Amino acid sequence: MKAMASADWYFDFVSPFSYLQCEQLPQLERSIRVRYRPVLFAGLLKAYGHKGPAEIPAKRRFTYQFVAWQAKRIGVPFKFPPVHPFNPLPLLRLAVAADADPEVIRRIFRFVWRDGRLGDLPIEWAELMTEIDMPDAAARIESPEVKEALRRNTDEAIARGVFGVPTLAIGEALFWGADATAMVADYIAQGCRFADPEMARVADLPIGVEREADKRK
């Protein structure tokens, strides 16, 4: 019997698109083994010198409306938290402290993006800890081991070329964004490769012109 292929799923709770893909992963997990890898999206942005979508006003507005539209279109319950962006570090460390358990991660995502809460109020944090059955979470997320594991995940993602979240990495193939989920399903169905020769051709397409470096720097 052929072994099931595996993928690493890089995500950050600050990303609503990570939530949308998290809700769709169980369908993919029928045919591929997924390892959940929490990473700090801000660390990826810093590594590549990019701005996040929320740092460009017009893009921020469109992104928020687009993800709300997309959630409704695919039938995923969705509600923005009171503010965004927010500091995801406590939640990311919580996922690490829970050994990246998929069910815990899914519950955290739903707490933020289905229920529209952040856990930044003591009563909300207590409710989340009860929901995931981790009463000692406040101490665990401050452990050096947990903090280092999150840094290691982020460094690993950067080393693999991951530039955004969510990203599914299957070997050297990277699939970025919740709207790439169907593409991942096709890739798996084709034996973790793309049979279309045009897909192979564009993967190594020559660069015709490059933008000049900003001379003001």
Give the positions of each predicted feature.
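Generic signal for short, ordered secondary-structure residues
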Residues: 4, 46-50, 73, 87, ...
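C-terminal cap of thioredoxin/glutaredoxin-like
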Residues: 6, 14, 18-32, 107-217
